[in-house]
């Protein structure tokens, strides 16, 4: 009996040691939604690829935009005995029951792309995302340089941003970041006066973005710079500017997401209006979430200081677009 007991203990120890390296680790992935979103699909695929590299396995459950269902999904993952949970929260506060259940079960939780309410953060190991304000600033800085090249360092530059919804955090962070980057450049050129128009909103949909951008362009025929806070609205913005007679050589545009369609546009038309696209790299966010899940299993908080892990992001201009364009991908990935 002692021999059998010793053998079992050794096997358990070996298993724990293997999981510490990722081999055999079971990661429960609670996704807010996948259907209809190439971005979320890419996020999950990045996580799955990273798990495969270290020998871990992902148990994926999709809540399809339903917070009640996502809470039930987390309970299912707990019942299945997963080692750690990666969660893409549908509702920052509504997943409180799941966070408490995971805490009671001794299962660490990593959030990715969207975080939890601040009241729940103490029970979260790590939040993985891009720093949206910093990423937006990359686009602003890049487009400001393009504007100086195109319009010179004297005169007025009228600019408008188009976001998702009034007051939504994503729009605020992305636009504030853009203007920080823009002003960082333009502050060195006092001959340029930036006239910032009121932000317009397109509900993150191309058809909803068309009318607002058309109307502001019609009312401001001297509009020179447009910043779209998501590539998904790009088609509607282009149509709106075309209808207002402004799409073409007189306009400069930056966008946000790093969608492959935007990258291809810059490859095909390097002198066109679109001159910068800030990339938030969902594949890399998913991969980082799995790395943080492994760190959480090992209790290594040093891997996620301050409970936040921002991935490195970049901005792509027509000069870099050929290097980042991969027809089989939907979004830009980090370069090795």
Task: List where the protein language model places each region.
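A residue-level marker of the well-folded mature domains of exported/periplasmic proteins
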Residues: 6-336
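Sec-dependent bacterial lipoprotein signal peptides
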Residues: 1-5
């Amino acid at each position: 009996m002692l021999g059998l007991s010793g053998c079992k203990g050794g096997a358990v120890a070996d298993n724990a040691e293997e999981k510490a390296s990722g081999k055999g680790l079971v990661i429960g992935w609670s996704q807010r939604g996948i259907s209809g979103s190439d971005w979320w699909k890419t996020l999950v695929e990045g996580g799955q690829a990273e798990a495969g590299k270290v020998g871990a396995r992902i148990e994926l459950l999709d809540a399809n935009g339903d917070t009640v269902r996502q809470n039930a999904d987390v309970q299912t993952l707990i019942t299945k005995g997963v080692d750690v949970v990666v969660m893409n929260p549908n509702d920052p506060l509504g997943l409180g029951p799941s966070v408490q259940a995971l805490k009671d079960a001794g299962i660490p939780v990593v959030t990715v792309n969207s975080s939890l309410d601040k009241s729940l953060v103490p029970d979260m190991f790590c939040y993985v995302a891009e720093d949206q304000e910093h990423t937006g600033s990359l686009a602003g800085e890049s487009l400001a340089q393009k504007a100086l090249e195109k319009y010179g360092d004297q005169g007025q530059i009228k600019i408008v941003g188009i976001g998702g919804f009034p007051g939504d955090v994503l729009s605020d962070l992305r636009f504030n970041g853009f203007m920080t980057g823009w002003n960082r450049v333009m502050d060195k050129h006092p001959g340029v006066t930036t006239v910032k128009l009121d932000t317009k909103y397109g509900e993150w949909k191309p058809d909803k973005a068309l009318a607002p951008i058309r109307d502001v362009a019609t009312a401001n025929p001297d509009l020179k710079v447009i910043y779209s806070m998501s590539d998904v609205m790009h088609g509607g913005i282009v149509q709106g500017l075309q209808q207002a007679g402004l799409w073409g050589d007189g306009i400069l545009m930056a966008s946000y997401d790093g969608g492959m369609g935007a990258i291809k546009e810059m490859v095909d038309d390097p002198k066109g209006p679109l001159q910068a696209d800030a990339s938030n790299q969902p594949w890399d966010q998913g991969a980082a979430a799995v790395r943080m899940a492994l760190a959480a299993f090992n209790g290594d908080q040093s891997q996620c200081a301050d409970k936040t892990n921002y991935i490195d992001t970049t901005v792509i201009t027509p000069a870099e677009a050929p290097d980042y364009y991969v027809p089989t991908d939907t979004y830009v990935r980090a370069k090795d």
